[in-house]
Every structure is written in structure tokens, then in C-alpha cells.
Amino acid sequence: MNKILVIILFSLVSLTWGTTWIAMKIATETIPPFFATGMRFLVASPILIILAYFTKTPLLFPYGQRWFQLIISIFYFSIPFALMLYGGMYVSSSVASIIFSSMPVAVLTVSFLYLKKKLFLTQKIGMFISLITLLTILLIELESQCFFQWKGILALLFALFSHAFIYSECQKKCLNVSVITFNALPSLLSGILLSTTSWFIESPHINTFSNRSILAIFYLGDFSGIFGILSYFYLQQKVSAFYASTVFLIFPVIAGFLENYIYKNAILLCEIWFIFPLIIGILLTLIPVNYLKKIRNKITRLSCLLF
């Protein structure tokens, strides 16, 4: 029964994250990105607050860390998610999903450079392979479109590393709060901030919003924003971080298939070939530290016996 539940959760998370990128593109067809992101959070936050009420989960972070809750609202929710929708206007969903499939690599890179975390040789090799391969894929994509999407790619990369930085900060502070606490108030604050800002910089006209863009907002807010995140965190409780993180290798395939089906945009053949080393690099960074320590200890003991 537990294995069936894990398979269901893994499939749901992969499907949810894979369809998210198409939903973002559909949402921004008629709705400006900042306003779309703000409405997405305003749709999600009431449900999260209700869940917090019925599960008796606190809305505020522990005393002494509440200032960090505001930082999360801005640099994990407001700016990165707005940049995701903005970047999705210029970049194909398949390429955008490939960028975000590198999240484990981005987190490891930030941990290495910012937190001075010691990495195993395997992790360093995986990080190097992944970053070089991702850069190559993005350069191929830029050249194929005459550098039209450079703004979108920069926006997505900034969003990626902003998420990675906040995640690393959470590790540094040993932040241990409920997933509902982490999302509820920051979503509400981000929704208010982005919606208000949008009225001044984007001047959205509600009468021009299409029905499918509005439906995409509700999908992003309720299904993807709540159901997808809760499913992923529940999956992490059922399996190791390594197996849970392999979802980052699956959802770009779903995003690419859906984009080809809906928009008839196929990923370039040369980019497909570079995806394989990218997957290898990401897998190398995901190998559990305990497993690497066991291998290192075995090698150390073997070398002592030989010499």
C-alpha cells in the first residue's frame, strides 16, 4: 500500500509541475505577468489559511525568525514567481522547465559558494557537468531565436537562484516550519504586493482577460500552488530526498510534450542530445551524502590495507 501511495504521489507531483509551465504560458496570453502572479497567490492564500486553521498550524514563523518570513515573501514568492511568468512569455515551456530542473544543482552551487559547504568530488563533477550543459543548451536556444529571448532566460535564471538562495538560507538557519506556515502568509503578502504594483506598472484591463487565462490562474493557484506543493512535501516524508528529487528529471519531459501538443513547438534535436549529460550531472549532485561517506570510508579502509 505504501509503494502504491508513493507511486501516486510521484506521478501527481510530476504531472502537476510539468503542467505548471504550460499553465503559466496560457495565463500570460491575456494577463500581464505581475498581475497574473499576484492573482495566483490571492487565489491560493485563503485556502492555505483555512487549512492552517483546521489543522491548528501557526501562520507566523517562530519568534525571532519572523523577519525572515517577510524576506521569503519577497525573494521566494513575489520576485521569482513573477519572473517565471515574465520569462515564460519569451522562452518556451520546455526550455523554462529545463532551467528549473537544475534546481538541485543551483542549491548545491549556492551552498558551496555562499555557505562554504564541503562537497564530495562526485558532487563537484555533477555540478560542473550540469552548469556547463545548461549554459550550452541556453546558448543554442538563444542563437536559434536570434537572441530574442535573452530577457526571459535572465529572468528565469534569477528566479532559479533566488529560490536556491532562500532554500540555502533555510538550511543555514535550520528553519523547521510546516509547509502550510511557509506558504500561507507569504502567499497572501505577495498577492497583495504584486497585484497593487501591477496596477501602476502594467495597468491590467480585466475585460481583455480570456476565460482560459483566468482558468490557468485558478489552476496555478489552487491545484499547482497548493496540491502540488503539499504532495511533494508529503512525498519527501515517504521516500528519501534522492528519490523525491528525481521528479526534477521527469516534469520537463511532460512540459515539452504538452508544449509540442498545444503550441506545436518542438525542442531542437541538438538540445535533446545535451539533455542526457544534464540528467547525469543532476543525478550526481543528488546522490545522498551518507552514501558518498560510506564509499569514502570503504576506499580509505582499502587504501590502509593495501599500503
From Swiss-Prot:
Keywords: Cell membrane, Membrane, Repeat, Transmembrane, Transmembrane helix, Transport. It comes from the Bacteria. It is a multi-pass membrane protein. Belongs to the EamA transporter family. The lineage of its organism: Bacteria, Pseudomonadati, Pseudomonadota, Gammaproteobacteria, Enterobacterales. It holds the Pfam family EamA. Residues 15-139, 161-287 form the EamA domain. Its main location: membrane. The keyword Cell membrane applies. GO terms for cellular component: plasma membrane. InterPro entries: AA-Vitamin_Transporters (IPR050638), EamA_dom (IPR000620). It is found in: Cell membrane. The chain crosses the membrane at residues 4-24, 41-61, 71-91, 95-115, 120-140, 146-166, 174-194, 214-234, 239-259, 267-287. This is Uncharacterized transporter BU281.
